[in-house]
Swiss-Prot record:
A GO MF term: iron ion binding
Entry remark concerning the domains of this protein: The ABC transporter 2 domain is necessary and sufficient for association to the 40S ribosome subunit.
Superkingdom of the source species: Eukaryota
Main location: cytoplasm
Keywords from the named record: 4Fe-4S, ATP-binding, Cytoplasm, Iron, Iron-sulfur, Metal-binding, Nucleotide-binding, Translation regulation, Ubl conjugation
Protein name: Protein Pixie
Cellular localisation: Cytoplasm
Residues of the ABC transporter domain: 78-323, 350-570
Record note on what altering P38L does: Larval lethal. Viable but with reduced body and bristle size
Annotated binding of ATP, by residue: 118-125, 387-394
Amino acid sequence: MSRRKENEEVDKQTRIAIVSDDKCKPKRCRQECKKTCPVVRMGKLCIEVTPTSKIASLSEELCIGCGICVKKCPFEAITIINLPSNLEKHTTHRYSKNSFKLHRLPIPRPGEVLGLVGQNGIGKSTALKILAGKQKPNLGKYANPPDWTEILSYFRGSELQNYFTKILEDNLKALVKPQYVDQIPKAVRGAVGDLLDKKDERELQTKICEMLDLSHIRDREIAQLSGGELQRFAIAMVCIQNADIFMFDEPSSYLDVKQRLNAALTIRSLLHPTKFIIVVEHDLSVLDYLSDFICCLYGVPGCYGVVTMPFSVREGINIFLDGFVPTENMRFRTESLTFKVSESATEEEIKRMNHYVYPAMVKTLGKFELTVEKGHFSDSEILVLLGENGTGKTTFIRMLAGNLQPDGEVELPMLNISYKPQKISPKFQNHVRHLLHDKIRDAYVHPQFIADVMKPMKIEEIMDQEVQNLSGGELQRVALVLCLGKPADVYLIDEPSAYLDSEQRLVAAKVIKRYILHAKKTGFVVEHDFIMATYLADRVIVIEGQPSVKTTAFSPQSLLNGMNRFLELLGITFRRDPNNFRPRINKNNSVKDTEQKRSGQFFFLEDEACN
């Protein structure tokens, strides 16, 4: 009898019901979920909706997982997930009934950098809050939260027991660099230099400002800083203070390749045998360069997240890309993500293509001067623009788009152009569905476009949301769909990876690549995520010179030559991972690094022949 009871217990516990606060509106529907639920019909209170309740309440113990309520809900507010295994005993935190649930925690180690990798909405920021001591883990008992004695006995025998004991005795001070740096000007006022002086506890301010290239903006007000400058300022503010735990939530957004590596070196300069460093990062090549070991997070965004045990850097990132955790024998993604140099047009197709030429151009904006060398492009190819921030990549794209007139009389090829700007500000006052209907009416109902672009970008899930309420990543996906849905000869896409998580970046890269190739169009892409840039590029336009003063955009080069030239400017070398061919940065002055620099091969494509 007890065996049967145990089995029932396990069956009950491996189901999780989520009701979305934003979508569930019991006063605006006929409560179809409650009326159609077979358990409610049998007289048990599986779904409760009282006249005063704001959202429906589902009992996970009584739910049989039939999924009828999920289909019947007019607002698509209910999600019922059968958990992969009995994870109930590993619950670390749950916010409330029918809400997000986090299983297990990453285990930081003193003197090493822990990297966290996973999708958006899977619990990385929740894990950081708990490890920083800002959120008390309730072990899933949201109605009756446990006290610290119970929490410590729960983590007994693991490294986290000592960690939380130290936090409780108040021996550990935690500093967190926030994820959304664009919110900083709303909270902080003053000049950069003054704010840094106030917090300079380690007396390393000058050194850190030099590493992060902040010395020339010390007199500027916070409100006048660009996204990249705010990001570097936020990293500097954390690095100059004394603390035991340093946490960085997405330190590379808004930064160019060179600044990303400088930020990584600055963060690694904090290493000390007694200090903990935790980094959440979506740019996999930077995460690889920055971390000593990695924890992956998998699950269903917004529903539940599971933290894996720590792995070495290479193994951790490969597990994330494979979508399979060997230690738990758990597959969390149906297909693995690989970086084989992607499909390109055959010689026959190249002969039939249209070839376009753009002339040499010069553009002066205030004190900044951009010189563009003459170049050409053809259908079905993507040109990636590589250069630091402030070298005129967006200016070049806007000149091609006809939004900006070059100096003098210059004839640009007459082309229809679709442009996705770098900064996306939602002005539209209605739902996503209306926006798509207004802007790309023909494309968004076309079965081919739905299969190639809309489905992989998961637009269906956000169709009925207000455009004003979308998160950064959702806005980015909508902007990409709008850009690709507009009929044009040339697609100009400025930073498609901003706000997207690692998985969405790779999906977006595949979507852009496939669409441009099959629709026989041309794409110009500005991208700082190195993995995404290498995946997308057929040819490369390198922009050199002194940022914000005088720069030159060279004519397009092959991927290998262009990358070599660009990496030589940065002084970095790349190798490829033998398993999934992703580019990996060599550690500075390592054997491989010295060897490649000596031979002048900064970018390796040696296994391209066998792909």
